[in-house]
């Protein structure tokens, strides 16, 4: 968006998103999508037409973007037209791409063991153990504070996870031991995984992702997987342990409108007595 031309409109869009409690990351993503569309169509935001959006959508697809990435841009533009420009009619003309349903690739238990054992840094091995052992997203792992580990109730407090919802995640006995070993060695003051250059800030998802892929290479695992795969592994391995699917949805923080109340009721008792799949791994102690 051209700053001098669209400043008032940009401000209005930001206000529209703020009123609806969009987080900063979502706001930046929405603004970037509108700016990209304007740049491609060589128009100011208030001049955009439905035909411009259609051309932009085709352009994104031809550039090789995934359906989910294209849809993300279209959702942002839908919001811009419907809310900020007050043109709800535009919704009918900005379609959402139908994405193919693909099953996520998961690692076997032995592959997860190899991956963790191939992580030489105690910090990253602990962080990856949390990602798998509690089924957390990368942003949730790096954003953990020491105070989020509740050893009395055997839960990990996840604040403002995806969808800006707080939840409790599974803290198994073995994961607690791993976390205690890490804490005793480093005594982090606030963040569980502090930044090496600034102990009062946490590591980034990008750094954790790099550690994951480094370990993947060392372990000789050639599957097309990413850091989020550990979360898929957590859910899949629990299913293989015959844990009820509704319980798993609670542990992951997933939300379905028709079953939200059920998940809330079973979450309290579900967190006690469940063995994390991490507990079943036969891990060698870290070097040093």
Region spans (language model):
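Conserved catalytic core of the tyrosine transesterase superfamily
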Residues: 1-288
């Amino acid at each position: 968006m051209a700053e001098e031309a669209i400043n008032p409109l940009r401000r209005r869009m930001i206000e529209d998103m703020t009123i609806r409690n969009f987080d900063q990351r979502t706001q930046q993503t929405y603004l970037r999508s509108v700016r990209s569309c304007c740049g491609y169509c060589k128009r100011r935001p208030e001049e955009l037409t439905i035909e411009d959006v259609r051309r932009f959508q085709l352009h994104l697809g031809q550039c090789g973007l995934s359906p989910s990435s294209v849809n993300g841009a279209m959702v942002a533009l839908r919001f811009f037209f419907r809310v900020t420009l007050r043109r709800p009619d535009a919704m009918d003309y900005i379609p959402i791409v139908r994405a193919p349903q693909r099953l996520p690739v998961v690692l076997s238990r032995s592959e997860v063991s190899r991956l963790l054992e191939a992580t030489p840094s105690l910090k990253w091995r602990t962080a990856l153990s949390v990602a798998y052992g509690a089924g957390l997203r990368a942003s949730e792992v790096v954003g953990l504070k020491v105070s989020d580990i509740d050893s009395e109730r055997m839960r990990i407090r996840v604040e403002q996870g995806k969808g800006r919802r707080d939840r409790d995640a599974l803290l198994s006995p073995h994961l607690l031991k791993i976390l205690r070993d890490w804490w005793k060695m480093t005594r982090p003051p606030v963040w569980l995984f502090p930044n090496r250059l600034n102990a009062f800030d946490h590591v980034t998802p990008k750094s954790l992702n790099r550690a994951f892929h480094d370990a993947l290479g060392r372990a000789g695992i050639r599957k097309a997987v990413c850091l989020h795969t550990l979360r898929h592994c957590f859910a899949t391995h629990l299913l293989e342990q015959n844990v009820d699917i509704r319980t798993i949805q609670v542990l992951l923080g997933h939300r379905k409108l028709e079953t939200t109340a059920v998940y809330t009721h079973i979450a309290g008792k579900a967190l006690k007595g469940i063995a994390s799949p991490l507990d079943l791994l036969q891990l060698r102690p870290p070097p040093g």
